[in-house]
Curated annotation (Swiss-Prot):
Its cofactor is Mg(2+). It comes from Listeria welshimeri serovar 6b (strain ATCC 35897 / DSM 20650 / CCUG 15529 / CIP 8149 / NCTC 11857 / SLCC 5334 / V8). The gene is cobS. Pfam families: CobS. The keyword Cell membrane applies. This is Adenosylcobinamide-GDP ribazoletransferase. Pathway: Cofactor biosynthesis; adenosylcobalamin biosynthesis; adenosylcobalamin from cob(II)yrinate a,c-diamide: step 7/7.
């Protein structure tokens, strides 16, 4: 329970007034609960979307659902997406890329990445067959994002100094990763049947490609690339679901 509270405090802005000492060993073992944090975020997103959809047009409800995640997470991983885009697409050497990611200012690549991320997200949501399924997507996608993050923890090499937030998860054992993937697959299968499982296969393929690209650019992962991977992973899952729905 302490590990779950610590993960909630780490990845969200949910106010839990309990001071817990950072135990990296137990945090790594308890990282199997990370998709459950995604479930909490997803439940909040679903609630906001559903309530707004009762009184407002669907596009407005979709925007509200997207904004709900920014509220509960503080835009933690959206900021990581911007930093990652600024760094990896700066055409600089590895050391300079890492410096750019640490810079609190957002560059042109970061702004472009965020704009197209949300435009693509909104367009895909509007392509979903029904509002009922959109609600379920708001619930499921944050779970997928945390599943992708867990995959990126596997045999992770940390880029730069080991003082960043992401370095806490260096050396996560294989079994929390396996448990997290089973949980994600269970939720996707329960909600979307075999279509959800097919979509996650696409997510796994994306994760492999993304990991390979990042390692070639900066030699490993850091907090920004981990967060960006989760954000893009849920977008890829949504894309795959819409693609399969369009084919069947």
């Amino acid at each position: 329970m302490k590990t779950l509270i610590l993960l909630i405090q780490f990845f969200t802005r949910i106010p839990i007034p309990i001071a817990i000492n950072m135990d990296e060993v137990n945090l790594k073992k308890g990282s199997a609960l990370l998709p459950f944090v995604g479930l909490i975020i997803g439940a909040w997103n679903w609630l906001v979307f559903t309530l707004v959809a009762l009184v407002m047009p669907l596009p407005v409800a979709i925007i509200a659902g997207l904004f709900a995640e920014i509220i509960i997470t503080g835009g933690f991983h959206v900021d990581a997406l911007a930093d990652t885009a600024d760094g990896l697409f700066s055409s600089r050497k590895k050391e300079r890329m890492l410096e750019i990611m640490k810079d609190s200012r957002v560059g042109a690549n970061g702004v472009i990445a965020i704009c197209f991320y949300f435009l693509f997200y909104g367009a895909l949501f509007l392509s979903v067959p029904s509002a009922y399924e959109i609600g379920w997507l708001f619930f499921v996608l944050p779970i997928v994002a945390k599943g992708v993050t867990m995959l990126l923890f596997a045999k992770m090499t940390y880029a730069g100094s080991n003082e960043g937030l992401g370095s806490i998860f260096l050396g996560v054992p294989w079994w929390p990763i396996a448990i997290s993937q089973l949980f994600v697959l269970f939720i996707l299968g329960l909600v979307f049947s075999y279509i959800g499982l097919l979509a996650y296969a696409g997510v796994i393929l994306f994760t492999i490609i993304y990991r390979t690209f990042v390692y070639k650019r900066i030699g490993g992962m850091n907090g920004d690339t981990l967060g960006a991977g989760g954000q893009m992973g849920q977008l890829v899952c949504l894309f795959c679901l819409v693609l399969v729905w369009g084919l069947i």
